[in-house]
Amino acid sequence: MYGISLIGTGESIRPAKAKEPEVKDLKEAYKTIEADHFAPRMEISFINGDKRDTLSYEKVTWNIGGEEKGLRYGENPGQEAALYKLVNGNLVLGEVEMLGSNQPLASIPELLQSGKHPGKTNVTDADNALNILRYLTDKPCAVIVKHNNPCGVATGSTLAEAYFRVNKADRLAAFGGCIALNRDCDMETAKLIVENYAEVVVAPDFAPGVMDVFATKKNLRVFRIKNMARLTDFVAKHVIDFKSLIDGGIVAQTSFSANARKPEDLIPAYCNRKITDKATGAVTYEEHKIKRLPTAKEYEDLVFGWLVEAGVTSNSVLYVKDGATVGIGTGEQDRVGVAEIARDKAYTKHADWISWEKYQKPYNDLRLAFGEEDGAKKQAEIMEQTRAEKGGLPGCAMVSDAFFPFRDGAEVGIREGITSIVQPGGAIRDWDVIDCCNDAGVAMVFTGQRSFRH
């Protein structure tokens, strides 16, 4: 049985004295840099009898204004925080080899422009963007993350096109987000980025002149992570994922890695339905299998969507089309509800984009910009177009991080015109969902792997 010892070396950890800010002080609280008391080094040891495997860490700081500083604060002002990089330790648990200390990514980002001092959420948002981008290296790709979930993910023939498409996917949520790019940021992409408000930009490197463009945004944090050029090295590697409990306990697990990364990894949906004769108790099995296989284009979107799913909080359902997210539903407790939320978000974002293209105004601002009567008329016209186009959902692939227990979840997407579904499979009523798809002419594939994320 493994035991875990957590050893801080150097200065001991002393919690800061709690202070209740007055309302007038709240704005200042967001500007305050917490002086953390975390030790400069940390070790975590896995002990099994006489065997001890130790992971060694060092605290990360940046030179900001001539001073060495760590994280601004944790998730909220008043929470001390520290970022540690792994400097030593090659751990093997069973047959699973953990990622070694010579391949850092988000734990040692090079801060090229500090803007506002980086905080914990800036680093974790960048990390989850990399968690998605590690699977999507074949084409230029952009991810925008906020609150540890993607606002959008999109590929393109160029990096600028990928950024344009990801911003279009959810222009509203992208405001103040963390933008991560899987190619060196060029001038065209940089000029598009500064047209909007972003908190963080992360890329392998930046072309000459790009930092001058970013300098016009004084609060923008710009991180260079050179190892992003080797993102494929991180696809099948694992790390130890620690979760602290409220009583100080720790849950340790190996990190998730998506197994279905290409079309041939996806399984055409099938199952054997168990039927028990009520009179005799005799058991027979009835085969159910999907009638239509995905097209080549659908396979591309199914794989893309499943890999994006690895970075979305559960329960989640996504709609994707042509290598871009259309609607993302996150963090819900029922699968039908999250499918509906993703659908509703697709409609909302579609309407907002129509408004932006026509009037250079957000949909919600049309009444302010054009007056109550004219603005309401414009909104009604946009909503009529959005409904006619079903929020851009026809032809989408529907992605679910866990199986559909009943057909009702799949039916949410089918009513909007989705043409393919990817999900883990394994529900007792898989047969019902398969029949539902066959009735609608929808292709469905299984991954054989759940993709929960909490």
Regions found by a protein language model. Give the residues of each.
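Active-site loops and adjacent core secondary-structure elements that bind or stabilize anionic groups
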Residues: 1-212, 216-280, 285, 298-307, ...
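Thiamine diphosphate
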Residues: 128, 338, 410
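Glycine- and Gly-Pro-enriched alpha-helical subdomains that act as flexible
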Residues: 151-171, 318, 326-406
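Amphipathic, non-transmembrane alpha-helical secondary structure
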Residues: 187-191, 343, 407-415
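Active-site/ligand-binding-proximal alpha/beta "capping" segment
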Residues: 293-295
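Conserved helix-loop functional segments at active or binding sites
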Residues: 311, 348-352, 415
